Design a protein with these regions (language model features):
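Preferential activation on post-signal-peptide N-terminal prodomains/segments
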Residues: 1-215
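Extracytoplasmic beta-rich ectodomain segments of secreted or membrane-anchored proteins
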Residues: 209-268
């Protein structure tokens, strides 16, 4: 399948990447318009170390964060471009283990469908630069959203998913439900917000396997998947960003994606 071929090519490109060279947005956009090519939009700003961890790539050549990637070939040489949106900087590196013929083979079964990036057409300059526009106006499906923990049964399920047993001390408070277990406290608000407070003497709950960005993101991803992921309906979770906000402290943010489109909730 195209997915399996694309996955394999990306893993090989990351594993064999040469030292990257900085490029501007013009060259990056030219790469997006060059055939053959495989384009990856991660929707959020993923640290390269996290992407490598998820894809089981054992390489530290590439650094920074990546929002977009394109694997393309120029004069028989396969190139991997990526765009670091937070730094407004692009990078390119070569891969000597992938032949241009393999890239051609991966995309050979695809047919031209007229889709363009907004930057490729002057009449689309009012749109965000990397918006992809089809010739036909798509007809979106209408979805609705509800608070998945409004009922007591769902709240109890969430409590157990977060590792607070059914026999934990619990009581209602102003606009929320408070649960205590081994001096750890969980606040489940009526509007869906959940706050965890570790015991003052420290807690073994939600321990990470290491101190790096990959361990922080992966630990949070597993926790988010076993809670939010079980209550997200047809949406899936994606990583928006991961930032270190103090020594050993990380702010990891996830969002909802529905059929490839980012979902905005409330005041987002």
């Amino acid at each position: 399948s195209l997915y399996q071929q694309s996955y394999s090519l990306l893993v090989e490109a990351l594993s064999s990447a040469s030292q990257p060279r900085a490029v501007g947005e013009t060259e990056f956009q030219q790469a997006l318009s060059t055939a053959p090519g495989l384009y990856f939009d991660w929707q959020g700003e993923i640290p390269v170390a996290v992407l490598n961890g998820w894809l089981s790539v054992d390489s530290q050549t590439l650094t920074g964060t990546v929002r977009r990637m394109v694997l393309t070939a120029v004069e028989g040489q396969v190139l991997l471009y990526y765009w670091d949106e937070s730094a407004a900087q692009g990078w390119v590196c070569t891969s000597d283990v992938i032949s241009s013929s393999r890239l051609n083979e991966a995309v050979g079964s695809l047919q031209e469908n007229g889709t363009v990036f907004a930057f490729e057409a002057e009449e689309l300059d009012a749109l965000a630069t990397y918006t992809m526009v089809q010739p036909q106006t798509p007809v979106p499906v209408v979805y609705s959203a509800t608070n998945p923990i409004a009922g007591e049964e769902r709240r109890q399920a969430l409590q157990e998913q977060l590792g607070f047993p059914e026999n934990s001390i619990s009581y209602p408070a102003a606009g929320e439900y408070v649960i205590r277990s081994r001096n750890d406290t969980l606040h489940i608000a009526e509007d869906g917000h959940v706050t965890y407070e570790a015991a003052a003497e420290g807690s073994e709950r939600y321990r990470l396997s290491g101190t790096g960005v990959y361990e922080a993101v992966e630990g949070c991803r597993r926790l988010a998947q076993q809670t939010l992921g079980q209550n997200s309906g047809e949406a899936t979770l994606y990583l928006i960003s991961a930032e270190e906000n103090g020594e050993g402290n990380w702010l990891v943010e996830f969002g909802y994606s529905l059929n490839g489109a980012q979902v905005r909730i409330g005041e987002e």
